[in-house]
Each structure stands twice: as C-alpha cells, then as structure tokens.
Amino acid sequence: VVETGQTPAARSIGIPLGVAQITARLERLPYSSWHVRARVIVGVATFFDAFDALAIAYVLPALIGPWHLTPQRIGLLISVGYVGQLVGAIGFGWLAERIGRLRTTVLTIATYAALSFLCALSWDYTSLFVFRTLQGLGLGGEVPVAAAYINEWAKAKGRGRFVLLYELIFPVGLVAAALLGFWIVPTFGWRYMFLIGALPAVLALVLRWLLPESPRWLAAKGRLEEADRILSQVESIVSRGGKVALPPVQAMPAVAAAEARTCWGDLFRGIYLSRTLAVWVIWFASYFTTYGMTTWLPTLYRTIFKFPLPQALKYSLLINVAGLAGTAACALLIDWTGRRTWFAMAFAGGGLSLGGLWYVGASDPRTVLLYASVSFFFISSISLAVYLYTPEIYPTRMRALGSSVASAWLRVASAIGPSVVGFTVGSYGLANVFLVFGLIALVGGVIAGLFGTETKGRVLEEVSP
C-alpha cells in the first residue's frame, strides 16, 4: 500500500511507509555535518544543565559566613535541588511521550533558565531554597529527554561514540562551572554564577526552528507522513540535494506504531523488568558517588582542611578535570568494550580507589585529591554512559519515560548523597565517607556485570522490540 501523502524519497524505497521504513532510512544515513549540528545545538542546553546543576557547589562556600550556614543546612540546600530534579525527570519524561522530544526539551530549558535568574535574586536562605527546588524541575527533565532525542537520530554502528560525544558536553559544563566559579565567585560575587545559568533562555525561544522532531517518535505515534517529510529533508541535506548517493536501505524488523499510550507498568513487563531494576541500580550507584563528592568537596576543603576559598575551588576543579578525561576515554572506547564491560570495570576501578582512600586515612588534602581524582575518572564515565545506555534498552514508545524514570534515581542518589556526607563527616569522620562511596560503587559494578544488557552495534528496534 502506497500512501498518497508520502514523499518521493519514501516511494522510491520500495518498502511501505511505516515504522520499519522510517527505521531503515535512519539506519542508512551516514553521520554527517547535520548530525553534528544537531548534537551541538542540543549540547548547548545540556552544557548549561550541567553548569546550573553544579553552580550551587561553588556558591555555597561564599555563603557560609554571611548566611551562617551549618553543615546540615548546606546538605539540605544541596539535596533539595535534586528532589526537584526527581520530580522534573519523571514529569517531563511522561510529557515527552505525549507531546514529543523537542517540545518537551524546550520546556525544560525555559524552566531551568528562568529559575536560575530567580536564584540570582535570592535574598536569604529560604528564597534560594525555594528557587533552587523549582529550578530542579527543568534540570531533571532536560538531559534524559535530550538524550532520548539524540539516540533516536543515531544509527547502530558507532552509536556509542556519536551519543557520548554529545553527552561529553555535560562534564564540560561541570568543568566550566568549576573554572568560572573559581574566578567569578571571589571576583564578582556568587549571584553571577546564576545569571550565567540563565543564558539558555535564548535557546528555548529558537530551538523548535533549529531542529525537527524525532522521526522515530513520530512514527511510533502513527504520524508517519510527518516522520517521512522530516526524514526526507534530512536525507536531502546529507546527500547534498541528491549529489551524494546514500547507502541502500536494508530491511528492518517490523515494528507497529503504538496503538495505546504507554503506562508506567510497561517498564516492569517481560524483559523490561530486569532491565529496569538493573539500570536503576547503575544510576543510583554512579550518581550517589559522583554528586556526593563534587557538591561537597569544595566545602570540605574549606571547613576541614581550612583552605582559603580560591584554593578550595582549585582542588575541586582538578577533580572535575579528571572526570572529564574519564568521560572522554569512555566516549572513544565504549563501542569497543561494550556497555556492560565498561560499567563493571569502571565501577571496580572507582570503588577500589575510594576504598584505598579510606584505608590510608584521608587526612591529607593532597591524598584526598589523588584518590578522589582516580575514582572520579572512572565513575564519572558511568554517569555519562548511562545516558547512552538507558535509551537503548527501551523501545521508542517508552524510551523517554524509561530514561527519565531511571534518571530519577540520579536525583534520589543526589539528594541522599550530600546529606549522607554531612551526617558521616559530623559523626564518623571524613575517611568513612569514602568507604561508603566505595562500597556503593562496588555493588553497582556487580549488578552491571551480572544483569546488564549488551547493546553495542545493535539497532534500537532489535535491542528493544
């Protein structure tokens, strides 16, 4: 059956217009400057998501004295942002299955940018507490929905590198927050960190005119002619108006368009039960460790080791640079090692490093810097790679929902982690903080190694029917 609304490109393929045809055309597209452009545009939003998420870590040391902050209030202020992110991740993930990946991404950017501006206007602890909580809604929703969007444009071969080179912008945003925090907070004041975080409001205004909706999502919703039209436009760009021949279309598994809306229970049916539970553990273990360390280390250097503010921020910057190096290595190697193997090895490397720091005592700031940097090199790569892996293990009909609900465990871990640090430091000493982190990381490695699903080199519709 040939539908009258389909484009000439679709009619020339010889496969009836349907989900399988859209998938086959996406899989035959070579990575091109168009894909890089899409990755960069979405990456700008993700860069500022990371920047805004970590900005609080570099603002807090400047507020300890003026606002008379106790360790308990610091931990609560850090944690409450992640509570907002938890709600935002689930809510915006649900919305992305209803109204689309791109429209939802625009809403998340507008939310976190506007609230960053309000954070800059905070006049006391309570106002910053409220604004930071609300900002978390947008911060929690943007990355998993954007990751689903980028995944749905990627073909099986080289998908790990393609997606992770986009995701790499997140740790770059973390490093940028550290660099700018090191310079801006002592020089201009803490409010400017939040003002910088409001800049992507401009992107929210123009994003829908810069990029199209995901054809995979449109096809899964039965909007085949829209998916065909968008894909034909991209094919024309990639082929330079037909001057460059595209590879032939290969047959793909037949996948029906979704006949009913996805419900939460679908995440726990059939093969997706074990996948969901395993990936939740991976998210929790990686972010409990990484966010617990990155948000608290500037303050720990300031309060326990009595560093002046610039030196405390400098040491924290070095750890983030180590994390950036680890994520870059992951982006280059994960299509070779596979997802499951990388997760197991990185959790083991990070967990053993943290256990070593507990063993030697964590009494010297340079020792803390060394061991924490090695650990961060490994575990921060997992924090990045789960944004690649999670969309791969769910079908299009629930890809954004599954990714967003899984990322909610990031928010749970990030909310609990800083509070655990504050409690453990006060009650049991600094060294035991790293013991807790190390044990959590090792548990994550065992679960990933035993129950992870290998997805490298496989078409999304094959991995998740």
Q: Which stretches of residues belong to each language-model region?
A:
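Transmembrane-helix signature of 12-pass secondary carriers
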Residues: 1-465
